[in-house]
Regions:
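Short, structured coil segments at secondary-structure junctions
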Residues: 1-3, 185
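Conserved beta-loop-beta/alpha segment of the NTase-like Rossmann-fold superfamily
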Residues: 5-90, 135, 139-140
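Fold-independent oxyanion-binding glycine-rich loops
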Residues: 11, 39-41, 48, 72-75, ...
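Alpha-helical scaffold segments in soluble metabolic enzymes
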Residues: 22, 26, 57-64, 84, ...
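Solvent-exposed alpha-helices and their adjacent loops that cap or buttress functional pockets
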Residues: 29-31, 37-38, 45, 61-63, ...
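A short, charged helix-loop
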Residues: 87-120, 155
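Short glycine- and hydrophobic/aromatic-rich loop-to-beta-strand nucleating segment
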Residues: 124-128
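Left-handed beta-helix
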Residues: 130-236
Length: 236
C-alpha cells in the first residue's frame, strides 16, 4: 500500500535524471543512508522470485560500496530499441564492471553486439545508495544539482512542494543514462534472468504475444494473412 506522501509529482517533464535526483534528495531527508531501486513502470517481469532475489542481491552490493548498479539482460535478438552494456572484468561475486554503454544502436551494430557475447541489454533497472547517486550528480550534472541542492533542508517538509514547483522546471532535460551512467567510472552490472521485457518496442511485444502456426501476431483486429510468416499486424 502506497501512502500519498510517497508519490512525487513532477511539475514538468525533464526526463529521468531530474526526477531521480529529486527522489534521492527526498529519500535522503527521510533516511540519510537509504538504498534505492529505480524501476520503470512499463516493464514486464515474469519471474517474480528471481527478480526479488536479484534486487536483494543488488541492494546488498550497493549498501557496502560507492557503486552505481544496473541489471543487465542477455539479448536474444539484435534489438535497436534498447541500450546495450558491454561488460568488463568480473568482481568475483557475480558483478561486472561496465566497460561501455551504447544507447539504441543501428541494426548492424546491434547484430555485432549480440554475436560478440560481451553485450547485454540495459534494463533501466538501477540500484544505488542515496549518497552515491547524489555525489555522481554533483560531479557530472552540476547544473541539475544547482537547482535541487538548495532545498536540502526543505525536502520531506511542507515547503517541498513549493520549492519543487519553482525550481524543477528549470532543471536540464537529461536522461540518467546519458547524464550519469554513460560517464561515471563506478558503474557495475549484475546479470539477471527474470523474464524481463520492456514493452516499449515491437520486438518485445511480439515475443510476448500469441502467434499462429506461421508465427504471425494479430492485435486488435481480425486479419487474413496469405503466404506471410513472422509478421505483427496492429490496427489503430
Amino acid at each position: 500500500e502506497l501512502d500519498e506522501k510517497q508519490i512525487l509529482l513532477e511539475p514538468a517533464r525533464r526526463n529521468t535524471a531530474p526526477c531521480i535526483a529529486w527522489a534521492a534528495y527526498h529519500i535522503r531527508a527521510l533516511n540519510p543512508n537509504a538504498n534505492i531501486v529505480v524501476a520503470p513502470s512499463d516493464h514486464l517481469i515474469l519471474k517474480e522470485e528471481e527478480f526479488r532475489a536479484a534486487i536483494i542481491k543488488g541492494l546488498e552490493f550497493v549498501s557496502h560500496s560507492e557503486k552505481l548498479l544496473t541489471l543487465g539482460i542477455k539479448p536474444n535478438r539484435p534489438e535497436t530499441g534498447y541500450g546495450y552494456i558491454q561488460i568488463d572484468e568480473p568482481t568475483g561475486d557475480g558483478f561486472y564492471k561496465v566497460k561501455t554503454f551504447t544507447e539504441k544502436p543501428e541494426l548492424e551494430l546491434a547484430k555485432v553486439f549480440v554475436e560478440s557475447g560481451e553485450f547485454y541489454w540495459n534494463s533501466g533497472l538501477f540500484m544505488w545508495n542515496v549518497n552515491t547517486i547524489i555525489k555522481a550528480a554533483e560531479i557530472l550534472l552540476p547544473e541539475l544539482v544547482s537547482k535541487l541542492a538548495p532545498g536540502k533542508n526543505i525536502y520531506a517538509t511542507d515547503k517541498e512542494k513549493a520549492f519543487i514547483e519553482e525550481n524543477f522546471p528549470a532543471c536540464p532535460n537529461v536522461s540518467i543514462d546519458f547524464g550519469i551512467m554513460e560517464k561515471a567510472d563506478n558503474v557495475y552490472v549484475s546479470l539477471g534472468d527474470f523474464g524481463w521485457s520492456d514493452l516499449g518496442t515491437w520486438g518485445s511485444l511480439y515475443d510476448l504475444s500469441e502467434r499462429d502456426r506461421e508465427g504471425n501476431v494479430t492485435l486488435k483486429s481480425h486479419s487474413l494473412i496469405y503466404n506471410g510468416k513472422d509478421n505483427m499486424i496492429v490496427l489503430p
